[in-house]
Regions:
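Active-site-proximal beta-strand elements of phosphoester/diester hydrolases
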Residues: 1-6, 37-39, 91-96, 123-124
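Surface-exposed beta-strand edges and their flanking turn/coil or helix-capping segments
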Residues: 3-4, 13-16, 51, 105-109
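Binuclear metal-dependent phosphoesterase catalytic core
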Residues: 82-130
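Flexible, glycine-rich phosphate/dinucleotide-binding loops
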Residues: 8, 45-46, 101, 129
Length: 130
């Protein structure tokens, strides 16, 4: 689980510190033969273009991702919006929030076989607030 350093940059912008990126690099090397899913607060590929919410200086993070081929997905929130994008073989999944309408959550299924790369399926489900 990664979270951007809010104490460095105030506001809604996220920032992944160098020691966090270094830790991620070591973990991805350690588990290089396994498919990895990263859970984090700030998305690298936002579901909506809002300059006020972007990750500050994501280049080092992308360098680490490009170096390792075992990351299959990154799941994040922050925008409170549903969205999915694919970049360089990594599925970037943004999840909605439960605190405001439309109240919903996301189910993520990952299917793996020895013959094929992992396949990821997502389903957005409404929350019954009655």
């Amino acid at each position: 689980m990664l979270d951007g350093a809010k104490e460095i940059i105030p506001g809604a912008i996220g920032y992944y510190k160098d020691n966090t990126i270094s830790w991620l690099d070591k973990q991805l090397t350690r588990y290089e033969k396994r498919p990895v899913i990263i859970l984090q607060h700030f998305p690298l590929l936002p579901p909506k273009e809002l300059n006020s919410h972007k990750v500050y200086q994501p280049e080092k993070y992308f360098e680490v991702l490009n170096k390792h081929k075992n990351v299959i997905a990154i799941v994040s929130g922050h925008y409170h919006l549903n969205g999915e994008k694919m970049q360089n073989g990594i599925y970037h999944i943004s999840t909605p929030a439960l605190l405001k309408p439309p109240y919903s959550y996301k189910i993520i299924d990952i299917v793996t076989t020895k013959e094929f790369s992992p396949m990821i399926y997502t389903e957005l489900r409404p929350v019954d607030v009655k």
